[in-house]
UniProtKB/Swiss-Prot annotation:
Signal peptide: none annotated. Keywords: Hydrolase, Metal-binding. A divalent metal cation 2 binds at residues 169, 201, 230. InterPro entries: AryldialkylPase_Zn-BS, Metal_Hydrolase, Phosphotriesterase. The lineage of its organism: Eukaryota, Metazoa, Ecdysozoa, Arthropoda, Hexapoda. One of its GO terms (molecular function) is zinc ion binding. This is Phosphotriesterase-related protein. Binds 2 divalent metal cations per subunit. It comes from the Eukaryota. Gene3D superfamilies: Metal-dependent hydrolases.
């Protein structure tokens, strides 16, 4: 019998409810810090406040406080927003912090207990540049053993074993580094054996998702259990998205709430708006891809939490879905993207 593995134990897929498939509640994102523009250096070095928030929104990766998404203030703010998510109808959150991002599994467990929201934790490796020496030298076989242990046996937290429920986010640069090729291969091998869900973070290059899928499929992974994340900053043409869908993976729009067109991590492109995300999802529905679509926010900096003037984890439910309904998207279509698709992706029988 298939089930979903949450940090508090197995549940039947129908208990997930509305699910955010790509979020973070605690992680270290300091590797992606960018020096601030000289004209705004003092504002971006100052503590985040109403007088500096405008600068942080424009240059989110140039505030060291903003990318330190792991201190006590961040954890308190994240908990507040998870409770708001629950209040506004949220059921589950898939926490995508993997090895290299300093995942706080103890905090995730505490959140699940205190808020009533189901949390699914991931295993797997982020990009090679953020790995410590003990992980950077792992072979494919050692990675496979690690992922299997995290899913089948679990990780000890305060005397209890906490199991991961999927492999992700598995991240890579472009061209894909050898370490990352190994992690993708290990992911494919273990997915074939366990049947679990997988989530990939492609680099900001249009070819990256296709190269990842090739490596994953060659290793034996099932496309139907694979999510390609961050497509709203990677593939900008509907034709590209349709081509990727032909490989069988889920297409995930997971930067809802990011409304600043200037994208510091790839200044050669303009970040699309929530309105464009909605428009693209509607076009993909017209292409017959409703059962392959997922939505989330990928919150990973403080300024996107409500305590710092942000939108929180409830943004899709309170702001985006009403706009989609107003444009003709049906309740059944929304339920497919936010309830059924996540449940189908996450459920497996190890």
């Amino acid at each position: 019998m298939t089930a979903v593995e949450t940090v508090l134990g197995s549940i039947t897929p129908n208990l997930l409810g509305r699910t955010l498939t790509h979020e973070h509640v605690a992680l270290d994102f300091e590797h992606f810090y960018r020096p601030p523009p000289a004209d705004f250096e003092s504002e971006l070095k100052a503590k985040i406040s109403m007088s500096t928030l405008g600068y942080v929104r424009l240059y989110p990766y140039s505030s060291k406080e903003n990318v330190r998404f792991y201190d006590e203030e961040a954890l308190e703010a994240a908990k507040k927003d998870v409770l708001l998510y629950k209040k506004h109808g949220g059921g589950s959150i898939v926490e995508n912090s993997s090895y290299g991002l300093k995942r706080n599994l103890e905090f995730i467990v505490e959140l699940a207990k205190s808020t009533g929201v189901h949390f699914i934790a991931g295993t797997g490796h982020y990009i090679h540049a953020v790995q410590d020496a003990s992980h950077a030298s792992l072979t494919v076989e050692q990675m496979s053993d690690l992922y299997t242990k995290d899913i089948l046996t679990g990780i000890e937290i305060k005397g209890k074993m906490v199991k991961c429920g999927f492999i992700g986010e598995v991240a890579s640069v472009y061209p894909i580094h050898e370490f990352e090729k190994n992690s993708i291969k290990a992911t494919g091998e273990i997915q074939e054996v366990l049947g679990c869900g997988v989530s990939f973070h492609p680099h900001r290059d249009a070819q990256a998702p296709f190269d990842i899928m090739r490596l994953y499929l060659e290793a034996g992974g099932r496309a139907q259990k694979c999510v390609m994340s961050h497509l709203d900053r990677t593939l900008f043409k509907i034709e590209q998205l349709v081509e990727l869908s032909e490989l069988g993976c889920y297409l995930q729009y997971d930067l809802f709430g990011t409304e600043c067109s200037y994208y510091q991590l790839n200044t050669n492109v303009d970040m699309i708006s929530d309105g464009q995300r909605i428009e693209n999802l509607m076009k993909l529905i017209e292409e017959g891809l409703l059962d392959r679509l997922l939505m989330s926010h990928d919150i990973h900096t403080k300024h996107r939490l409500t305590s710092y003037g942000g939108h929180g984890y409830h943004h899709i439910h309170t702001n985006i879905l009403p706009r989609m309904f107003a444009r003709g998207v049906t309740l059944e279509q929304v339920e497919q993207m936010t309830v059924t698709n996540p449940a189908n992706w996450l459920s497996f029988d190890p």
